[in-house]
């Protein structure tokens, strides 16, 4: 049995009083983050324990903080600490103050278990039959999502409540025990990602890039134009922002659905999956095709393949970033170094005269590398 962390996202339907409390919670979470960032703005890291020690005094000075879940005060500090850690590792810029208008409205609360008169109580409870979730301070809220899910098997760890496109959502993190099947690999596949075709497989199959951004691009441009002309603080501006957020939400959902469809099919049909290890940040830096790369969502696709492989007992490998998969002839291994121009889609091997299609050739080379990795691991295990 293997323990995994799984997230279930539901849409919430709070009452007016619950909405007020949610908005207060978002505001206080942002206030705590900004308060301790202001005190540590010129530092490279923060001491979260020292910040937590200062909380009781801060609550005394601001009585309105008692109205919300006390857990979100600490998690806001933990989020700030994570931001500083990412900054110190060079993964992001220095943490910035959160804006009331621009920053994402969200907070996280942990599930706290307590015992009273022999009964066990959890601060976060989900009833899928009645379609209700119980959250600290908010009591029960109606939820919707996962039509076929009858019961969540596992321990609820925490819940992240957020607002997106004027709708409220809760993402529940659950620790589950998963029985991973032991399989004997019978089929392997190599995958090459691209812009025109999001995936080319070593079997010669190409999966088209839906280019979701093209469907919504004109609408986004039009709404942004109206937004620029609207008066700050006006009702009309608020309506435009709401419409814009809805369009972005649709775009995000369309991308994710398509990627889940692709990854599910690949995992179902294959036992060894190999793809490239990509450095997306480097590829998009000052690149004329950066928008197309972001729209293709390669990182999300690879991430899905990785965790789904683990859950299903499949084997997932990534070849080195600088492995010349497009330059090597899969037939004889000859390397043609003059193939840096992406416009060259077909080339003839000078060594064996084999005609190679760029993407299919690359995916076959990636497949061979994956098989080599598998055999190497098997020999080391013996």
Predicted regions and their residues:
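Stable alpha-helical structural segments in soluble proteins, enriched in small hydrophobic residues
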Residues: 36, 72, 76-87, 360-370, ...
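Gly/serine-rich nucleotide phosphate-binding loop at the start of the catalytic core
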Residues: 1-73
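Long, hydrophobic, amphipathic alpha-helical segments used as structural scaffolds
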Residues: 37-44, 84, 88-95, 176
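Non-catalytic, well-ordered alpha-helical scaffold segments
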Residues: 20-23, 27-30, 34, 71-78, ...
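Acidic carboxylate diad motif detector
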Residues: 53-164
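Hydrophobic residues positioned within well-ordered beta-strands of beta-sheet architectures
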Residues: 8-10, 159, 170, 189
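Positively charged, helix-rich recognition surfaces that bind polyanionic ligands
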Residues: 150, 164-382
